Amino acid sequence: MRTLDLADPTSWRAWSGGHSFDMSFIDPYRSHGDPNAHLCRTLDNISPGDIQGGSLTYNTVAHQWLWVGQSIGGAYFLLSPDLIDWTPGGLFFPAQVTWDFQCGDKDPIEYPSLIDPTSTSRNFDTVGNTAYLYFTQFHSCLEDTLDRDLVRVPISITK
């Protein structure tokens, strides 16, 4: 969603599914229009379709947005110049994930995220040519325990 004025509810615009944020919202209690025709659309061109969670940072080496998420097989990355069009997912870090885990498999991971401790941005939302991949690794056959580790793996990014 986008707006130029946070205080003005009528100025908010949502993604319409095209190439811009041009969908206006309506008040379902005061308007006679169909509220379903004014919903924010999803980005259906992100692949693989089952990639989940993760982190979104701007990579200062590739000059693109870098999304790291998880899917069967491990942690994946996608790149985008504009947050609309995305590259196909590439395997970033092979690992077992929780939703296809069975006892006896390698310990699964969740929540992959990139953080560059040298980032000068306020929220560490930029990544340069080196960063760390953080993730949670679960133990004990995914029983309801707190037996898990926060793991940090150094990475290098080249153009």
Where are these regions (language model features)?
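Beta-rich carbohydrate-recognition and catalytic domains
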Residues: 1-53, 58-104, 119-159
